[in-house]
Swiss-Prot record:
Its biological purpose: Cell wall formation. Catalyzes the transfer of a GlcNAc subunit on undecaprenyl-pyrophosphoryl-MurNAc-pentapeptide (lipid intermediate I) to form undecaprenyl-pyrophosphoryl-MurNAc-(pentapeptide)GlcNAc (lipid intermediate II).
Example GO biological process: cell wall organization
Originating organism: Bordetella petrii (strain ATCC BAA-461 / DSM 12804 / CCUG 43448)
A single GO molecular function term of this UniProt record: undecaprenyldiphospho-muramoylpentapeptide beta-N-acetylglucosaminyltransferase activity
Protein name (record): UDP-N-acetylglucosamine--N-acetylmuramyl-(pentapeptide) pyrophosphoryl-undecaprenol N-acetylglucosamine transferase
Pfam families: Glyco_tran_28_C (PF04101), Glyco_transf_28 (PF03033)
EC number from the UniProt entry: 2.4.1.227
Length: 357
């Protein structure tokens, strides 16, 4: 008997690709054949094939914010992409199609629905992306990482790496800690200029005896300027371009200062760590602010708009934080964790594949 086949559609950013890979791992462990519809010239082209998953090529990308000329080309690009998707679906004949977001998912999902194939859509952010808003109308099952995102949406959470889910609980980790607070600053692989410029100046305003210890990850191209900023501020800091074991780093931290991508928010909850979110203000539909509010509205994190993040504000805010308070926030964050999200999404894929068309 041939193994059942899932075609995962996701691309463009790690926020779509990484949760798709987590679901792919679960389905492969259950004996499924996994294929991936994506653009070989984009991030999925670098991340997916090394995981042993065949990439089915789809050359399509979004035009939002690219000007009038790009918008005029959209109908022709979409028609070509739909033609490619139809051909791939005819050849692959998947038992279920899983759309995890990104522009590449739109033509693939449309053609899957037109062919009568079971389509499952998962939206990671608290504000649905363009592709998923359309595909949700056609999908057999609609899943989301946050509540009240899409009509008919079932909240299953966002898949998180297993090493993050495996961390001991906050009470076990925070127990016995003494001395300065341990702060982890994560700007992502490309860094975050607002964090890189504000943190050194804020910490310089705090008495050295009360100043948190800091590990600051900011991307390779920002390392020199970041180290110079801390040196000029007279603040010792462990500056890194990449953190190999992010789960361990989060587990060791009392406080995380970071952006608010969907996967970051999910990992904060899964790890059970206190976090100050500084959402990227130029994210489409300001979805990072909506993501952060899921925890901040529950007193399970803090939210500071980037426009309000000044060295003076941050220094004053840090002076008020205590380890018992951070532990309480971390425990509330973990109450919102969904460690079984990848397995639950895989379950839905299996159910959709078994249901008759």
């Amino acid at each position: 008997m041939n193994a059942p086949t899932v075609l995962i559609m996701a691309g463009g950013t790690g926020g779509h690709i990484m949760p798709g890979l987590a679901v792919a791992d679960v389905l492969r462990e259950r004996g499924w054949r996994v294929l991936w519809l994506g653009n070989p010239d984009k991030m999925e082209g670098r991340l997916v094939p090394p995981r042993g998953i065949d990439l089915v090529p789809m050359h399509f990308q979004g035009v939002r914010g690219r000007g009038v000329a790009a918008m005029l080309k959209l109908p022709f690009l979409l028609l070509r992409a739909c033609s490619q998707a139809w051909g791939h679906l005819t050849r692959v004949r998947p038992d279920v199609v899983l759309g995890m977001g990104g522009y590449v998912a739109f033509p693939g999902g449309m053609m899957a629905a037109l062919r009568g194939l079971p389509l499952v859509v998962h939206e990671q952010n608290a504000v649905a992306g363009t592709a998923n808003r359309w595909l949700a109308r056609l999908a057999r099952r609609v899943l989301s990482g946050f509540p009240d995102v899409l009509p008919r949406g079932e909240v299953l959470g966002n898949p998180v790496r297993r090493d993050v889910c495996a961390l001991p609980g906050p009470a076990d980790r925070y127990a016995g800690r003494t001395g300065p607070l341990r702060m982890l600053v994560v700007g992502g692989s490309l860094g975050a200029h607002a964090l890189n410029t504000t943190l050194p100046r804020a910490l310089a305003l705090i008495d050295p005896q009360a100043r948190p210890q800091v590990i600051h990850q900011a991307g390779a191209q920002h390392q020199q300027s970041l180290r110079e900023a801390y040196a000029q501020a007279g603040v010792p800091a462990d500056c890194r371009d990449f953190i190999e074991d992010m789960a361990d780093a989060m587990g060791q931290a009392d406080l995380l200062v970071c952006r608010a991508g969907a996967m970051t928010v999910a990992e904060v909850a899964a790890a059970g760590v206190a976090a100050l979110f500084v959402p990227f203000p130029h994210a489409i539909d300001d979805h990072q602010t909506a993501n952060a509010r899921f925890l901040s509205d529950a007193q399970a994190a803090w939210l500071c708009p980037q426009g309000e993040l000044t060295p003076e504000w941050l220094a004053d805010w840090l002076r008020q934080r205590t380890r018992p308070e951070l532990l309480a926030v971390a425990e509330r964050a973990r109450q919102h964790a969904r460690p079984q999200a990848a397995a639950d999404i895989a379950d839905v894929c299996e159910q959709a594949a078994r249901r008759p068309s």
